[in-house]
Amino acid sequence: MLVFDKVNRVYPDGTQAVKNVSVHLEKGEFCVLLGPSGAGKSTLMNMVNGLVEPSSGEIILDGGVLNKKNLQLIQRSVSMIHQQLYLIPRLSVLHNVLTGILPTANFWTSLVKSFPVKDQQRAFELLSEVGLEEKHLMRRASALSGGQQQRVAIARAFMANPKVVLADEPVASLDPAMSRSVLNSLKHAAQTNGATVLCTLHQIDYALEFADRIVALREGEVFFDGHPSDMDEDIQKRLYEIEHETKEKMQKNHQKALEDSLSFELKIKAVA
């Protein structure tokens, strides 16, 4: 079980990115975090993987506290799928998946035959689970399509048998059909391997289709936590409104910054 217990995060500039978040996620649960940019989604993810410390409250995984004092627990239990893929282009698909065990191994990349047979078998199984055919195993990762590469990243994330997998906008650059295919692969891998998935998305329809649980955030606070079937039209409408309000606010702030910069340049030229 992954537990956020009254978690807060205040940055040095005084910005409170996360406000009193309490969420309990069960083993194997596929949880989607929804909310506009700046809602606190990334901060929550970064606290789980140890990059950011809670200002107060705790994040607990099966009784152990996740923080910088307990990095071994994080390294052993938490895996990450990034929006920006970090595959090694010149390595084969199989070898890229095998690198998923390297944080707990005593060697860097080597020939595939240097990995134990059981690890190679595990990689074969994971690639099959995410829908990559055997013919792709020895191809270079750089030769694959974007959706295929994301499947490789998913398989790699499960290689070390993590308890928690964090997925940061895993379908941001994919078309709708491929996005659904990749999310289906991610959910299937999570169910098969018994891992809890915490996934950030911007698309409400994907969350409603694939999530076991949706947690929606606004300005660091949870305003919805429940099953997709509990997210009625009023809540969905409010979420769209929040997204629109946030975009307008960001655009205004950007415009003001440009105007301030231009004003400063004109003052400098006037003095000169």
Curated annotation (Swiss-Prot):
<keyword id="KW-1003">Cell membrane</keyword>
<keyword id="KW-0472">Membrane</keyword>
<keyword id="KW-1278">Translocase</keyword>
<keyword id="KW-0813">Transport</keyword>
<dbReference type="InterPro" id="IPR017871">
    <property type="entry name" value="ABC_transporter-like_CS"/>
</dbReference>
<dbReference type="GO" id="GO:0005524">
    <property type="term" value="F:ATP binding"/>
</dbReference>
<feature type="domain" description="ABC transporter">
    <location>
        <begin position="2"/>
        <end position="244"/>
    </location>
</feature>
<comment type="subunit">
    <text>The complex is composed of two ATP-binding proteins (PhnC), two transmembrane proteins (PhnE) and a solute-binding protein (PhnD).</text>
</comment>
<keyword id="KW-0997">Cell inner membrane</keyword>
<dbReference type="Pfam" id="PF00005">
    <property type="entry name" value="ABC_tran"/>
</dbReference>
<dbReference type="InterPro" id="IPR003439">
    <property type="entry name" value="ABC_transporter-like_ATP-bd"/>
</dbReference>
<keyword id="KW-0067">ATP-binding</keyword>
<dbReference type="GO" id="GO:0015416">
    <property type="term" value="F:ABC-type phosphonate transporter activity"/>
</dbReference>
<dbReference type="GO" id="GO:0005886">
    <property type="term" value="C:plasma membrane"/>
</dbReference>
<dbReference type="InterPro" id="IPR003593">
    <property type="entry name" value="AAA+_ATPase"/>
</dbReference>
<protein>
    <recommendedName>
        <fullName>Phosphonates import ATP-binding protein PhnC</fullName>
        <ecNumber>7.3.2.2</ecNumber>
    </recommendedName>
</protein>
<dbReference type="InterPro" id="IPR012693">
    <property type="entry name" value="ABC_transpr_PhnC"/>
</dbReference>
<feature type="binding site">
    <location>
        <begin position="35"/>
        <end position="42"/>
    </location>
    <ligand>
        <name>ATP</name>
    </ligand>
</feature>
<comment type="function">
    <text>Part of the ABC transporter complex PhnCDE involved in phosphonates import. Responsible for energy coupling to the transport system.</text>
</comment>
<comment type="similarity">
    <text>Belongs to the ABC transporter superfamily. Phosphonates importer (TC 3.A.1.9.1) family.</text>
</comment>
<dbReference type="InterPro" id="IPR027417">
    <property type="entry name" value="P-loop_NTPase"/>
</dbReference>
<dbReference type="GO" id="GO:0016887">
    <property type="term" value="F:ATP hydrolysis activity"/>
</dbReference>
<dbReference type="InterPro" id="IPR050086">
    <property type="entry name" value="MetN_ABC_transporter-like"/>
</dbReference>
<keyword id="KW-0547">Nucleotide-binding</keyword>
<keyword id="KW-0918">Phosphonate transport</keyword>
